[in-house]
Amino acid sequence: MGQIKKKHTAGAARNFITRTQAIRKLQVSLADFRRLCIFKGIYPREPRSKKKANKGSTAPVTFYYAKDIQYLLHEPVLDKFREHKTFAKKLTRALGRGDLHDAKRIDENRPRYHLDHIIKERYPTFMDALRDIDDALSMLFLFAALPASDDVSARLVSEAEAICTQWMAFVARERLVRKVFVSIKGVYYSANIRGVEVMWLVPFRFPQNIPADIDFRVMLTFLEFYTTLLHFVLYKLYNENGLVFPPIINSTKLSGVGGINAYVLESRQNAGVVPQIEGNSEAKVENVSAAVLSKAAKADAGEEEEVEEEEEVEDDGLDSFSAEKGDALAQPTFNSTAGQLFSNFTIFIGREVPLDIIEFLIIAFGGKVISESAMDELIDNEDETRGNVIDEKTLKQKFNLASVTHQITDRPTLREKVPGRTYVQPQWVFDSINEGKLLPVSEYAPGERLPAHLSPWGDAGTYDPTADVSDASDDDEDDEDIEVAPEDYDKDDEEEEAEAEAKQHQRELEAEAKGTKADPAAAPKKAKRKADKMTKAEKQEEEDKKLRMIMMSNKQKKLYKKMQYSNDKKSDREAELKKRRKLNEKKEKR
């Protein structure tokens, strides 16, 4: 007889581990455990049977894979967390003794960790990193829009803003933007980078009211990881396109209006060395640290060495396989129509229009930008330095206002109009980009009622404001003719209908005997006969649905009911919107 196995030593109890057990095994605090899991990409798991995984207990706990926790035991960052705990004790002891010299020495030698090896582990290829930077970009743009506070330092905000501007400058220069959508949350952008669609959200630059219930420790951990990831991605993109990284910063433009025009993207052929930032030392926070650059360069060189080693392998006697070159995708060029939409235009942007959004889109599609805000900044600087006022002629010559073809304004009426300019509202830029062609400007003239601004990634089954509602109104009228719903038909209704037909037949016989015609109003309607046939078919379909539901499990039934509920809700909402639209159109006709 074989030995009896102990309980909870195999299966789910062996494959899963609770969070408390994981923290005890790693010998770290809960905060450090969370940071480590975020860095390594480890997240809680849901076992099929929580009772078996928790060794018979039904207490609510969080589970992780035991192999994931075992994998964390050999992480170098874990050792740095332990060293930091020792460092904090030494620093507290020195400050308690009042030994400031010793405290300063300890603080200078604080343990520091790097995430470059984690980036290479989680993203073995550059394409893997590109497919996963959507959330990273959205997070960095969010922190770039936040005000500096006790939770978020000014250094983090400025660093996030610098990375975001470097990204926008690269995407605009290479003309990679494909779609844009302005929503209540912010502006969604979509770019095609090496065949990968990258989408990110840029919040509006409004004063932010930060809620008190936000856990900034978790968000700052994600920010730390995403910052390192984007440093590597940006270095790779700039390097592959032959550009100097970090880009040169024009301190004059940066101190003024700023934006992507303040970043000068220069080719490495024209620059022998990596340039330094122009301007004072306060702007040096915009630069990427030399350590990050050296790590990115080493990582890039390491990849090249690996490729060379793979090429040196002798292929004698090896089978040859035709591998699909998934990463070698055609990159769009300037000759494509996608990046040349505004190439023949010089667009003047009014001061009431958000400059950062419109300027980025126009430059990304080949246009030239002249902003009224930059002109105001120049006038203010001249007034402060020289004490004189720039005349209109000098201003026109400096900004070449005679070449302006379009002016974007967000005002209902304009006092003066310059001859030769086409005046449009900002939505014309967004809709033209999404359509891939220049739309007629008559619908977007100042003061005109704008068409619906729809998401270019919208679902096909949802309500479409641009669709014609005439077909929908005809369907509604047909539905009104059918008075009886399928579920209201029963045997009593069939008996009443048979009696009505018998009475009608009796009337026809009496009319023939008298030599007159029967009353057509008393005849049964064809629509009702059609309804009878429709209801029989629907009845059969309903019975088939019920039979199929009998074969479902309880879990499948609940899921099916949820799906039906959401579909009914969408259809009701769509019908309500169509009804409102018809009422509005009737009012406009009156």
Swiss-Prot record:
GO molecular function: ribonucleoprotein complex binding; RNA binding
Entry's transmembrane regions: none
PROSITE patterns, per the entry: BRCT
Disordered: annotated segments: 297-318, 452-590
Coiled coil: 489-589
Main location: nucleus
Residue ranges, compositional bias (Basic and acidic residues): 500-517, 532-547, 567-577
InterPro entries assigned: BRCT_dom (IPR001357), BRCT_dom_sf (IPR036420), PES (IPR010613)
Keywords for the protein's UniProt record, in alphabetical order: Coiled coil, Nucleus, Ribosome biogenesis, rRNA processing
Domain BRCT: 337-446
Biased composition (Acidic residues): 302-318, 471-499
Intracellular or extracellular location(s): Nucleus, Nucleolus; Nucleus, Nucleoplasm
One GO cellular component, as annotated: nucleoplasm
GO biological process, any: maturation of LSU-rRNA from tricistronic rRNA transcript (SSU-rRNA, 5.8S rRNA, LSU-rRNA)
Complex formation: Component of the NOP7 complex, composed of ERB1, NOP7 and YTM1. The complex is held together by ERB1, which interacts with NOP7 via its N-terminal domain and with YTM1 via a high-affinity interaction between the seven-bladed beta-propeller domains of the 2 proteins. The NOP7 complex associates with the 66S pre-ribosome.
Function in brief: Component of the NOP7 complex, which is required for maturation of the 25S and 5.8S ribosomal RNAs and formation of the 60S ribosome.
Similarity field: Belongs to the pescadillo family.
Entries under PANTHER family matching the protein: PESCADILLO - RELATED, PESCADILLO HOMOLOG
Stated name of the protein: Pescadillo homolog
Organism: Yarrowia lipolytica (strain CLIB 122 / E 150) (Yeast)
Gene from which this protein is expressed: NOP7
